[in-house]
């Protein structure tokens, strides 16, 4: 039946996402305090698993014809609100960073970056990661325009997913070789908090793109109907922009 509103069925996914997110933040505090990592990984896996199951059900609703243009407009608004909430999250992190950097405390020597910190050279691994992430932005845009032109875009979308995995691997290598930890003062805390949460967003965005790649291979998209892929692309560009700010201020300016 045609209608101009979205009829929601009963679903356990919102409460499951809530519980997983609450567990993630709680286990993050436990990890910072006691170094116990298992709960953090379990809750993160739970978030990904519930998100995948929820997304699968939404896809099945769309393929069954339940999503008209009014419903899709609601999805668009929801994604914009979600992106705005993510923006405010990173805005809070950058607020903390600039509060510490522009008015350094006496216990860090009154200068920024703190005295005695051996920072990561921004023109080494961070610059390489910047090139990788910007290249992934180009490849995902290429995939989008190829689809709009009614051409194949699976290769460029696959390339984007590979670059996401490459970025994550290099980021983990950087953490392993860094000479400071999250416990080394305000800079160490902000550095690992900002880049770590960005890394989680890269992981989530890469899985989102891979999920849409599978849908593309199953012929769920065409040049006129690919809303899920557009959401993934918008999210990925947001991740790109956040990394540019991290590179310029947390890596380069602090160095």
From Swiss-Prot:
GO terms for molecular function: cytochrome-c oxidase activity. It is a multi-pass membrane protein. Coiled coil: none annotated. PANTHER family: CYTOCHROME C OXIDASE SUBUNIT 3 (PTHR11403:SF7), CYTOCHROME C OXIDASE SUBUNIT III (PTHR11403). The gene is COIII. One of its GO terms (cellular component) is mitochondrial inner membrane. Keywords: Membrane, Mitochondrion, Mitochondrion inner membrane, Translocase, Transmembrane, Transmembrane helix. Belongs to the cytochrome c oxidase subunit 3 family. Component of the cytochrome c oxidase (complex IV, CIV), a multisubunit enzyme composed of a catalytic core of 3 subunits and several supernumerary subunits. The complex exists as a monomer or a dimer and forms supercomplexes (SCs) in the inner mitochondrial membrane with ubiquinol-cytochrome c oxidoreductase (cytochrome b-c1 complex, complex III, CIII). It is found in: Mitochondrion inner membrane. Disulfide bonds: none annotated. This is Cytochrome c oxidase subunit 3. The chain crosses the membrane at residues 12-32, 35-55, 77-97, 114-134, 153-173, 190-210, 231-251.
């Amino acid at each position: 039946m045609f209608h101009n509103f979205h009829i929601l069925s009963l679903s356990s996914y919102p409460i499951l996402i809530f519980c997983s997110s609450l567990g993630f933040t709680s286990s993050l505090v436990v990890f910072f305090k006691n170094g116990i990592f298992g709960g953090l990984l379990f809750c993160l896996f739970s978030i990904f698993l519930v998100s995948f199951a929820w997304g699968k059900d939404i896809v099945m609703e769309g393929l069954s014809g339940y999503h008209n243009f009014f419903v899709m407009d609601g999805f668009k608004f929801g994604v914009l609100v979600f992106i705005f909430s993510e923006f405010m999250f990173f805005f809070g992190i950058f607020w903390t960073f600039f509060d510490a950097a522009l008015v350094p405390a006496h216990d860090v020597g009154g200068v920024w970056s703190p005295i005695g910190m051996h920072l990561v050279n921004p023109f080494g691994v961070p610059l390489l990661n910047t090139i990788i992430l910007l290249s992934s932005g180009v490849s995902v845009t290429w995939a989008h325009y190829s689809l709009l032109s009614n051409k194949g875009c699976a290769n460029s979308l696959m390339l984007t997913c590979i670059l996401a995995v490459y970025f994550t691997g290099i980021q983990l290598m950087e953490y392993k070789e860094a000479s400071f930890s999250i416990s080394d003062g305000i800079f160490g805390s902000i550095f690992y908090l900002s880049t770590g949460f960005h890394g989680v967003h890269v992981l989530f965005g890469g899985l989102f793109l891979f999920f849409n790649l599978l849908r593309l291979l199953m012929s769920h998209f065409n040049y006129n109907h690919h809303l899920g892929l557009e959401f993934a692309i918008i999210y990925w560009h947001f991740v790109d922009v956040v990394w540019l700010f991290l590179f310029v201020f947390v890596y380069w300016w602090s160095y």
